[in-house]
Amino acid sequence: MSESPMPPGTPDVPGLVVGRFDPPHLGHSYLLDAALDRCDRVAVYVNSGPRDAAPGRLRTAWLAELHPGAVVIEIVHDLRTDFDDEALWQRWLDLFRAHWPFEHGPEVVCSSDPYVSELARRLGAEPVVVDAERLTVPISATMIRRHPAAHLDRLAPPVRAWVVANWL
């Protein structure tokens, strides 16, 4: 498994980043920038469901604005996360493949989360872990949802404005 920093992109290496990005923060931007540096093309799947704190379409638009080199796709579903459930894994893989925007791949899956190795293996891709300990950008979306006012400095301007208007 690779660890960031990553070597410069090579032609025709499509990458995948998956997350809720609820809300997107500077740690997510660090991850996406690392994926864009490593891969020729990057698809970003924004998992979206009815219980999310920020609307999925808005999170998708923010990420597309902040990372114009990525193809950002909202994936609306009600799937839970259970890494021991084979049938559920298959549903996740079917969902991801159905939305894949490129002719082949992914060849690389980038994440800061532990599931990256298994997801990459199941997709036949290389797992790339980026700042798993969150030392480079010490923040998580959970921390922001719990105490938004304390972490406004970890949000890009459009996200910060929305959080201030809607959560504070």
Model-derived regions, located:
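Nucleotidyltransferase catalytic core that binds NTPs
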Residues: 2-168
